[in-house]
């Protein structure tokens, strides 16, 4: 069976086409706040793939999701938008109001949560998200500005400091302003993760664009980097979705 999986974020649209659980095509593109228009440009390509179903993770509002739904109707196959539930597939949501939890975080937790295992799941994307699980119970988590948001905020709110692009590659004290900024921001986020990891034993799992960078500084916790974690969560969601 061929399936199309869509991850529609605030700035990017990612898609995977799988056949018998194997990824046969994957792409990610900036959608410039118009994901429906980007999807419209891909629809003919999708139409020739012999797809059987579509699973979607979307952070968009209802109006934009409805536009996405209308475009995908042209493929004439079942479409499922993943949602956050108080309980799903045995996983208990840790939020008081489940709908306030981001669907991307929910799917990442759904992908890995299992009985008798505790996880710390770090999403290294536009924001740094941290979710904790104890068995099949989601415990909630934390959201922090990522490396680049912190740097940009510092630039915008500090007169007289010009900070060019530079690698976040070191935790040592900076010997110049550029290094002091980059090393300080990275140290702050790494220290936050370490503080959480030291509270109780748990497996550390990293996903997102900067996952490998963070893993480099967290080696003592034996981090696992999962590049397609959201896809796995979306597949898990569809596997437990009620059949008509």
From Swiss-Prot:
Question: Which top-rank group of organisms is this from?
Answer: Bacteria
Annotated catalytic residues: 104
EC number, UniProt record: 2.7.1.33
Q: Where in the cell is it found?
A: Cytoplasm
Q: Which reaction does it catalyse?
A: (R)-pantothenate + ATP = (R)-4'-phosphopantothenate + ADP + H(+)
Might you report a single GO cellular component term? cytoplasm
Q: Which Gene3D superfamilies match?
A: 3.30.420.40
Q: How is the cofactor bound?
A: A monovalent cation. Ammonium or potassium.
Pathway given for this chain reads: Cofactor biosynthesis; coenzyme A biosynthesis; CoA from (R)-pantothenate: step 1/5
Q: Which GO terms describe its biological process?
A: coenzyme A biosynthetic process
Tell me the residue numbers annotated for binding ATP.
7-14, 126
One Pfam family in the UniProt entry: Pan_kinase
Q: Which CDD domains match?
A: ASKHA_NBD_PanK-III
Q: Which InterPro entries match?
A: ATPase_NBD, Type_III_PanK
Q: Which GO terms describe its molecular function?
A: ATP binding; pantothenate kinase activity
Record's keyword terms, sorted: ATP-binding, Coenzyme A biosynthesis, Cytoplasm, Kinase, Nucleotide-binding, Potassium, Transferase
Which cofactors? NH4(+); K(+)
Has UniProt tagged this entry with the keyword Zinc-finger?
A: no
UniProt cross-references to NCBIfam families, sorted A to Z: baf, PRK13322.1-1
Q: How does it assemble?
A: Homodimer.
Q: What is this protein called?
A: Type III pantothenate kinase
- To which species is this protein native? Acinetobacter baumannii (strain ACICU)
Q: Which gene encodes it?
A: coaX
